[in-house]
Amino acid sequence: LVEKYEIFKRYPSSLEIKIYKTKFLAYVKKDGENFLLGSNNKFILTKNIIEKIPLIHGNFRSDDFKNLKNLIDETNFNFKEIKNLYFFPSGRWDIETYSGTLIKLPKNKLKENIELSEIILTDNRFKNINLIDLRQENQIVMNEQ
């Protein structure tokens, strides 16, 4: 599957074509079928399972996910550690990691809250945390196993 392509005309009579393959970023279940969401922002029907990409739950637009993914990429949060993403009608996201931690993000100030959750997750004092709730401004709720 193609994310983008470039065509250059080389004079006098040749073309140089570059094709960039799309990367699969997440799984989505819609109407009982499995789709892959590509870096080209398109849904691709699939029957194959690819390990280590998150499953997205909820009714979201591909732009909603793209915005979240771009914010995660701007931080030190490791996208490959995300097992599930939950999108809510209010427009906010929850992140579940492979280590079993659920991060409840607010609708606003996503980038700084993603950075804060990464700091908490990498601090050994909080290694048994299974819930980080950042929905309330100036307040963090954490729960240990």
List where the protein language model places each region:
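Charged, solvent-exposed interaction patches on well-folded alpha/beta domains
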Residues: 3-145
